[in-house]
């Protein structure tokens, strides 16, 4: 249970489970894991700590990466869907310009970023994944893709070289597709929600402009 959720703690307390974890770590465990506050890693550390106290041998290594475990057929389908929209001979930068509430960046923010990416990476396609709301903060300037199937979306993103998007479910889906993910953070705490692994990085947009974002993209593409 998330330790800040009182209703969650009550629900767990009333459950019939033999063992119940209420989402708290000791100072000692937190000192061992500087990333303990990350929402994907915290439950793993809690479970490992509990199992260790029960006498089980537990892993000590990094928390495994999120992984959709896309198979070869799904990946091939994702690439085929991408190739329908862009120049197949070029590699692709994938973007998602939507998010909920205050996490959503305005067209005035996104359009300069999009134009900078086009200028800095003329040899790359840029494709946009759309939300269910069918809105684009770049006014549908790039080829767009949408699916009701999250695995199909993940496979589409996996066919790209890098993904850029605000803190959202699609950002985490991109990370789980094993695509290097640039997570944009302006109002939420990146240390709790940042994408991790596979070259993914959080970006504080309060101090990072379009050119700096493009520099980070260039660094990822150069490693590719």
Set out the residue ranges of the language-model regions:
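Catalytic machinery of carbohydrate-active enzymes
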Residues: 1-224
């Amino acid at each position: 249970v998330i330790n800040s959720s009182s209703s969650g703690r009550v629900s767990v307390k009333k459950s019939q489970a033999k063992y119940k974890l209420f989402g708290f770590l000791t100072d000692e465990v937190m000192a061992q894991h500087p990333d303990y506050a990350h929402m994907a890693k915290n439950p793993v550390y809690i479970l490992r700590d509990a199992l260790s106290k029960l006498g089980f041998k537990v892993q000590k290594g990094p928390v495994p990466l999120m992984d959709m475990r896309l198979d070869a057929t799904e990946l091939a389908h994702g690439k085929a869907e991408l190739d329908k929209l862009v120049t197949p001979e070029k590699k692709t930068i994938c973007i998602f310009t939507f998010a909920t509430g205050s996490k959503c960046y305005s067209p005035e923010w996104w359009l300069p970023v999009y134009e900078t990416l086009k200028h800095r990476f003329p040899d790359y396609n840029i494709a946009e994944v759309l939300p269910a709301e069918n809105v684009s903060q770049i006014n549908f300037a790039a080829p767009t893709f949408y699916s009701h199937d999250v695995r199909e979306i993940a496979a589409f993103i996996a066919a790209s070289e890098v993904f850029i998007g605000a803190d959202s479910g699609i950002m985490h889906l991109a990370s789980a597709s094993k695509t290097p993910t640039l997570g944009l953070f302006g109002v939420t705490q990146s240390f709790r929600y940042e994408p991790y692994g596979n070259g993914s990085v959080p970006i504080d947009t309060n101090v990072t402009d379009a050119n700096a974002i493009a520099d980070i993209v260039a660094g990822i593409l150069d490693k590719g």
